[in-house]
Amino acid sequence: MKIGIIAYQGSFEEHFLQLKRAFDKLSLNGEIISIKIPKDLKGVDGVIIPGGESTTIGLVAKRLGLLDELKEKITSGLPVLGTCAGAIMLAKEVSDAKVGKTSQPLIGTMNISVIRNYYGRQKESFEAIVDLSKIGKDKAHVVFIRAPAIAKVWGKAQSLAELNGVTVFAEENNMLATTFHPELSDTTSIHEYFLHLVKG
């Protein structure tokens, strides 16, 4: 199994480590690679889009030709996990809590509406307990950093976890989106769930 992590910025190194732990926990053999240009996608079984600055990631991916390639592969069924900025990238609808509608480059394959900076810029980061029982896991201690919120899900998209009534983890077919940073959590639950999705 080969998993690629978009490695322009953000906590991609932490995703590497968390993914390795998840592979070990599930007794799976896996290869983890960095993805920066379209040819890096060759032969990957799943992709992680980490946190960072969603507009920057989108612009760089577009300039290097990766954005369209990702969209095509994800639409064709390539499993993907988008965390924080990655969740924004996957959303079909994006707005900003302060400035409203945005025109940033997106992959835009998932039936979710995301609000950037939902918790306000002054609340840069916070930690919370999230119930992961819908994926057969225990509650998890997770980290939110300038987090967005999934304001709406529709079609085949469904909410897998909420915090104070707001969706923080959603799934649609081959796509997973979290508004928190599972790579900074003390549990590998989200990465394990992603690997099960990749494994089929």
UniProtKB/Swiss-Prot annotation:
<comment type="pathway">
    <text>Cofactor biosynthesis; pyridoxal 5'-phosphate biosynthesis.</text>
</comment>
<feature type="active site" description="Nucleophile">
    <location>
        <position position="84"/>
    </location>
</feature>
<comment type="function">
    <text>Catalyzes the hydrolysis of glutamine to glutamate and ammonia as part of the biosynthesis of pyridoxal 5'-phosphate. The resulting ammonia molecule is channeled to the active site of PdxS.</text>
</comment>
<keyword id="KW-0456">Lyase</keyword>
<keyword id="KW-0663">Pyridoxal phosphate</keyword>
<feature type="binding site">
    <location>
        <begin position="52"/>
        <end position="54"/>
    </location>
    <ligand>
        <name>L-glutamine</name>
    </ligand>
</feature>
<keyword id="KW-0378">Hydrolase</keyword>
<feature type="binding site">
    <location>
        <position position="116"/>
    </location>
    <ligand>
        <name>L-glutamine</name>
    </ligand>
</feature>
<dbReference type="InterPro" id="IPR029062">
    <property type="entry name" value="Class_I_gatase-like"/>
</dbReference>
<dbReference type="GO" id="GO:0004359">
    <property type="term" value="F:glutaminase activity"/>
</dbReference>
<keyword id="KW-0315">Glutamine amidotransferase</keyword>
<feature type="binding site">
    <location>
        <begin position="145"/>
        <end position="146"/>
    </location>
    <ligand>
        <name>L-glutamine</name>
    </ligand>
</feature>
<feature type="active site" description="Charge relay system">
    <location>
        <position position="181"/>
    </location>
</feature>
<dbReference type="GO" id="GO:0008614">
    <property type="term" value="P:pyridoxine metabolic process"/>
</dbReference>
<feature type="active site" description="Charge relay system">
    <location>
        <position position="183"/>
    </location>
</feature>
<dbReference type="GO" id="GO:0006543">
    <property type="term" value="P:glutamine catabolic process"/>
</dbReference>
<dbReference type="GO" id="GO:0042823">
    <property type="term" value="P:pyridoxal phosphate biosynthetic process"/>
</dbReference>
<comment type="subunit">
    <text>In the presence of PdxS, forms a dodecamer of heterodimers. Only shows activity in the heterodimer.</text>
</comment>
<dbReference type="GO" id="GO:1903600">
    <property type="term" value="C:glutaminase complex"/>
</dbReference>
<protein>
    <recommendedName>
        <fullName>Pyridoxal 5'-phosphate synthase subunit PdxT</fullName>
        <ecNumber>4.3.3.6</ecNumber>
        <ecNumber>3.5.1.2</ecNumber>
    </recommendedName>
</protein>
<dbReference type="InterPro" id="IPR021196">
    <property type="entry name" value="PdxT/SNO_CS"/>
</dbReference>
<dbReference type="InterPro" id="IPR002161">
    <property type="entry name" value="PdxT/SNO"/>
</dbReference>
<dbReference type="GO" id="GO:0036381">
    <property type="term" value="F:pyridoxal 5'-phosphate synthase (glutamine hydrolysing) activity"/>
</dbReference>
<dbReference type="Pfam" id="PF01174">
    <property type="entry name" value="SNO"/>
</dbReference>
<comment type="similarity">
    <text>Belongs to the glutaminase PdxT/SNO family.</text>
</comment>
<dbReference type="GO" id="GO:0005829">
    <property type="term" value="C:cytosol"/>
</dbReference>
